[in-house]
């Protein structure tokens, strides 16, 4: 689905296994976007995304740093978001340490439903200049509660405009469960790094790129694209214009 979304936006996509990348780190030089899709890497053993995060942190840290310095993009969806936080790539205020995590849902169960999101900041390259107040995406996770290590980190994320998405209800108001399915602090659903080049999001934009993927499309009528498509379109447009 992630591959399809990027291809629909005009990108040429290769699916590269982490072991291949670890064996040939120079592969990163051939690409402009690194996407970590949703799923259950390593069976979510230890904690969701932690093993992949360690592989990235201890084997690819310099390569990822170069990737970002070259103005390239990284997207983490669900398990990919969990991986980016545990690798210290998000929120990346103090680049030497992990500052946030995605932990077990307050409900202590797997949550699978559609949620409303509001776009809080256009700091992220993936959201630049979008004038869309609300988007509707599916979620599917057991460890989707976003928390920071302390209040200072949270305040910095907020003041830096790194909070890109928040959970809201159908009236556009921030609300608790079930609209905020994991119990994330401040209803945070997605954040970016200080450069805006790295985006992590718990809901699944790749599962709503076609209008017919909306659960009420027969009643609401068809739009040109599904709500999640803007993330992939903006990323590809950025690459075409800047890299």
Predicted regions and their residues:
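Catalytic beta-strand/loop cores that center a nucleophilic Ser/Cys/Thr
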Residues: 118-195
């Amino acid at each position: 689905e992630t591959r399809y979304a990027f291809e629909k936006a005009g990108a040429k996509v290769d699916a590269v296994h982490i072991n291949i990348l670890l064996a040939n780190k120079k592969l990163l030089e051939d690409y402009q976007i690194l996407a970590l899709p949703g799923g259950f890497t390593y069976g979510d053993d230890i904690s969701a995304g932690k093993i992949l995060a360690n592989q990235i942190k201890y084997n690819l840290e310099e390569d990822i740093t170069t990737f970002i310095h070259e103005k390239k993009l990284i997207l983490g969806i669900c398990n990919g978001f969990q991986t980016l936080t545990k690798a210290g790539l998000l929120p990346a205020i103090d680049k030497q340490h992990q500052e946030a995590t995605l932990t077990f849902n307050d409900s202590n169960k797997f949550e699978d439903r559609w949620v409303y999101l509001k776009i809080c900041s256009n700091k992220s390259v993936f959201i630049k200049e979008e004038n869309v107040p609300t988007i509707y995406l599916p979620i599917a996770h057991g460890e989707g509660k976003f928390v920071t290590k302390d209040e200072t980190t949270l305040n910095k994320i907020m003041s830096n405009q790194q909070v890109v998405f928040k959970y809201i209800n159908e009236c556009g108001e921030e609300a608790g469960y079930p609209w905020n399915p994991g119990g994330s602090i401040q209803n945070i659903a997605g954040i970016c790094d200080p450069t805006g080049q790295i985006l992590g999001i718990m809901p699944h934009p790749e599962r709503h790129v076609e209008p017919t993927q909306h659960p009420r499309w027969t009643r609401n009528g068809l739009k040109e694209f599904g709500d999640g498509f803007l993330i992939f379109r903006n990323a590809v447009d950025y690459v075409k214009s800047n890299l």
